[in-house]
Structures are given as C-alpha cells and as structure tokens.
C-alpha cells in the first residue's frame, strides 16, 4: 500500500520490505517549436484552393459518345421504361379497360375504403354525405321513433281533456249530444259495467268507456246506441266526485269499483 504526498508526489510505503528512496518528480518546460506555417484545422475545406486534376480528353470524348448512343437506343424502343408517356391512356381507353369498375356500374368499385364502395356501404344511396357537424342532428331528426301503437280508447286524462275542449266549444255553438254507453244501459256479453256521470258544467252525460262524439256531428251508426240516461248508473261506485270546473279542473274518477248484486 502506498501513500502519496501532495508536495513531492513520492510514494511512501507502509511496509519496510518495499521501501525505496524518495525522489521528486520535476516537470521540465519546453518551448514550442518554431514553425513558419501550420495548417489551419478550423478552415472550411470548400474554401481551400483545389488542386488542378489532369483530365484526359480522349476519355471525355468517349463518355460523350456513349451517352449519345445510349439516348438514341432508348428512344428507338417503343414502350421503354424510360418513356412513361408510352403507357398513358386516353379517357376512352381508360373507361373501356379500367379494372376499377364491374360491368357498367360506375359505383361498383373495388375500393374497400369505408363509405367509398357501394358493394360494402351501409348507405344505399349515392348522394353526397352530409357535413360532419350537421350529420348527427339531421340523422336524429329523421330517425323513426318506436312509439307504441295508439290505443283505441282514450285514458282518463285524455278523456278529461277532450271533455273540457268540448265544453269550451259548446259555449259558442250548439254541439250534438254525446250518447252514453254505460254498462247499465248497454250490457254487452263479457263486459263489466263502467262508470258514467253527468258534468255539472256542461249538463251532459259522459261515459268513461269511450265517447261517441265525432267532429261531423253524426254519431257512429254501426254501434248499438241507447237513449240518453239521466240517472247515475246504479251498478258503479266512484270514490271521488266528478269534475267541478271543466276549464280549470282535470279531475277524473280515481278508482272504479264494480259492485255485483247478490
């Protein structure tokens, strides 16, 4: 193991068997060599003076002669790859020989890009596509909505709205009477009695099964119509009173309980 001194840089051994006499290291200063000229390493190579090369005039003439012969030979061959205009086709030849179309269908192409080929296009029309910003809202507006089929009979709310509309119209002109079809006066086989009531506003009798009123004023003729009954049906019970005001109130019977007599 050697320990070096910073001053003398002399290795000092810690072992007695490896001891040697200390010697100092001296650095001798030498003057740079005197040179009249040295190459500038930072000079751009392109700016240096080029040496004149010897050019053989016979070899230069031979190269020019070979170039002329090669150009003449290439121009004499029809359809040579160096003349690509030989392969250019007119529009008529392209229409006849182009493999991009099948038969006479201009839209039946081999292009398999999305929405570019009619053979794999989910849109069956050839009209131009809508702009991207208006495509979604236009598609949503024109999309058919799956609505349930409209029932033949109106529900309680629709019946009440229709009654109020008829009452508002009856103030200006006389409307035909609504023929009631209650279960008590029109007992059809397989049907339970329904609740019919008289409106205090219009003074008419309404049946909750359905209204036999038409815009033309003539009731349906194929139905079995019964005369207007002025009493409340005895076989039905309502848990809530009928509508009090046809204009402001949309009350309808909440629960209808058919009562069977023993």
Curated annotation (Swiss-Prot):
Keywords: Cell projection, Cilium, Cytoplasm, Cytoskeleton, Differentiation, Flagellum, Mitochondrion, Nucleus, Spermatogenesis. Its main location: cytoplasm. Expressed in testis. Strongly expressed in ciliated epithelial cells with lower levels in goblet cells (at protein level). GO terms for biological process: cell differentiation; flagellated sperm motility; protein-containing complex assembly; spermatogenesis. Induction: Down-regulated by IL13. It is found in: Cytoplasm, Cytoskeleton; Nucleus; Cytoplasm; Mitochondrion. GO terms for cellular component: axonemal A tubule inner sheath; cytosol; manchette; mitochondrion; nucleoplasm; nucleus; perinuclear region of cytoplasm; sperm midpiece. Disulfide bonds: none annotated. Pfam families: SMRP1. The keyword Cytoplasm applies. It comes from the Eukaryota. GO terms for molecular function: alpha-tubulin binding. Microtubule inner protein component of sperm flagellar doublet microtubules. Interacts with alpha-tubulin. May participate in intramanchette transport and midpiece formation of the sperm tail. May play a potential role in somatic cell proliferation. Belongs to the SPMIP6 family. This is Sperm microtubule inner protein 6. It comes from Homo sapiens (Human).
